[in-house]
Amino acid sequence: MPDGAPQELLEAQLTTRADGITILELAGEVDMSSAQILVDQFVAISGQRLDNVILDATRVTFIDSTGLHALTEGKRKIHEQGTRIFLVPSPQVRRVLELVFPEPLFAARVDSVEEALSQIQLQTTGDR
C-alpha cells in the first residue's frame, strides 16, 4: 500500500438490544494488524454468558488466516459456554469460509441480521 493511502482498519461495535440479543458488528479488514480487536470482542462476549450472539460481518471487506484463526477460536470459546452464534457474512467472508472449511464452521450462518433475529425468535418461542 503506497504511503499516504488510507488503511482500512477493523471497526467493532458490541451492542445489546432491549430484548437481550447481543450483536457484534464488524466493518473493515480482519488481518494480522486487526485480529486482536476481534479477539478482545470475543473475550468480552464470553464473559457475559449469553444465549445468542449475532456476528454481523456484512461490512468486512477482507479476512486473512490470522482473522480466520481469531474467528474460529472466538467461536469455539463462546460456543463452549452454550452460546449460539449466528454469522452474517459478507460475500468475501463467505467465500473464504467456504474455501477453507468444506463443512460449515458456523451451524447458524444466515444472510441477514433480520433472518438471525427471526431464527432466535422462533427458537425462543419453541423453548416455551
Where are these regions (language model features)?
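Conserved TIR/SEFIR loop-to-helix hotspot centered on a Trp-containing motif
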Residues: 63
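STAS-like cytosolic regulatory interaction modules
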Residues: 1-60, 76-128
